Amino acid sequence: MSGCPFAGNSVGYTLKNVSMEDNEEDRAQTGVNRASKGGLIYGNYLQLEKILNAQELQSEVKGNKIHDEHLFIITHQAYELWFKQILWELDSVREIFQNGHVRDERNMLKVIARMHRVVVIFKLLVQQFSVLETMTALDFNDFREYLSPASGFQSLQFRLLENKIGVLQSLRVPYNRKHYRDNFGGDYNELLLKSEQEQTLLQLVEAWLERTPGLEPNGFNFWGKFEKNILKGLEEEFLRIQAKTDSEEKEEQMAEFRKQKEVLLCLFDEKRHDYLLSKGERRLSYRALQGALMIYFYREEPRFQVPFQLLTSLMDIDTLMTKWRYNHVCMVHRMLGTKAGTGGSSGYHYLRSTVSDRYKVFVDLFNLSTYLVPRHWVPKMNPIIHKFLYTAEYSDSSYFSSDESD
């Protein structure tokens, strides 16, 4: 008998495969095209006719169509759409705080989820500059003359975003020696003024931190115990260094110790804190700073894990906004050099001046690392407090009482 002994099985297997594929295809076609019956369709739902026809090339209007202007418009429109989504998330978070719903920890999960979403969007916005950078400076120069006096500074949504997060008006860099709002007229100016008068995310987070459970002097009294432990720890550190026999090593360590001591003791000087607050070098109230530091130290406790995630997200947003500004500066420098901006500003030089801690909102959270101390210097929680932090449902200081302290 000639031929492959497995030929029959092979053909059978092939036919079976074809049959199975036919069945899969049949199942794939069992749906119903509901759109054919009328009603809302994809393009109408997203209003794509408006969006996809919102790219008017000024170079084309002037009779000299430049290809890369289309990319320039699309990229900036995408930025504005994402700014709108960030404002949507930010307003919802501010509303939760304003209505006091943040005391219910179930709502804290909403806050965390929405702030994380803002973080992810900002990461996308930072990366989006790479698309614009596929255009050369010469390509941009071909249509730049058609843009004036339009300028990125005129982005209403970005200014609203800065205000609602909590950028201090006193720390803003003047735009051509004028208040930033002077560059917006009519309704836009009113919207910006209104956003300045509303409670910022910074103020709402500050009030929330001031209620951190465990700060009460007649309760756990974290701050009082922490100060006591710091003084004791510094004294022990001083004696340890004093006992050293190597004079050179001893001198170096003593100099470092004095610096550390000055930094840590300043932490308990409320008047100095208020002075730095008045100068804009600190943003949070003294009690809010205590709450943030307590969350920082006890972040592994179940009660403080979610609050710590929020503080982390706030720092992430600050970091990403700084990166966004920096990438913007680099792109402008690359495209314009040191020429003036299309809106009349000094361009690169003005933008570079905004990449600083003046525009950081939660700078105090970054500075918490300054006060890191050995773990055994951090006050220990007694079993009652530890159990309470695990079982409490609401972040309200009234849940602590004096008989729960050491």
Curated annotation (Swiss-Prot):
| Pathway linked to the protein | Amino-acid degradation; L-tryptophan degradation via kynurenine pathway; L-kynurenine from L-tryptophan: step 1/2
Binding positions for heme per the UniProt entry: H328
First-level EC class: oxidoreductase
Q: Which reaction does it catalyse?
A: L-tryptophan + O2 = N-formyl-L-kynurenine
Q: Which residues form a coiled coil?
A: none
Q: Where does substrate bind?
A: F72, I73, I74, T75, H76, R144, T342
HAMAP family given for it?
T23O
The protein's name is: Tryptophan 2,3-dioxygenase
> Where does this protein come from, organism-wise?
Mus musculus (Mouse)
